[in-house]
Amino acid sequence: MKLHYPLCASLLALAACSPPPPAPPPAPVERPAPPVTPAPPPVLRPSANWPEWPLETGDWVYRRDERGSLALFGATGQNAIVTLRCDTTRRRLYLARAGAGPAERMIVRTSSTLKEFAASPTGATPAYLATEILPTDPILDAMAFSRGRIALEVDGQQPIAIPSWTEITRIVEDCRA
């Protein structure tokens, strides 16, 4: 039995000479989540009966400047939702609606008719989508005499209904004079 003690002692000494255990793996580095870009709100189609759509909140304001006359519709102290401009030099009217995107068409609905126009971004800040209308276009008379409201539908934008007030008639008359 005495022979076993030296052997056991040797084995214990050898066991004590083993390499240290490996270092634990480094803690995972938390990477911040990529910023979440909210999806654009879906364009809700109101009922097909557009005269029942709620009117946008705001008032029409008439102004004159070096280019001609301008009617702006929107809430006081905020950017206009809709503009109608008469460029007296070019003898053109421009109907614009607040919004951005690759719009291709604008539909103007009145109590008597509707008309589709090509629309494009104006490049202005804030962003607007606009169409050019000749002063002799019958849609202008339909807008001026529409029964209480006009609807504007622009690709990629929420359709809106705005009141038909005398400022529209003033802009049309300015461009026809």
Give the ranges of each region predicted by the language model.
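Transition segment at domain starts
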Residues: R45-V82
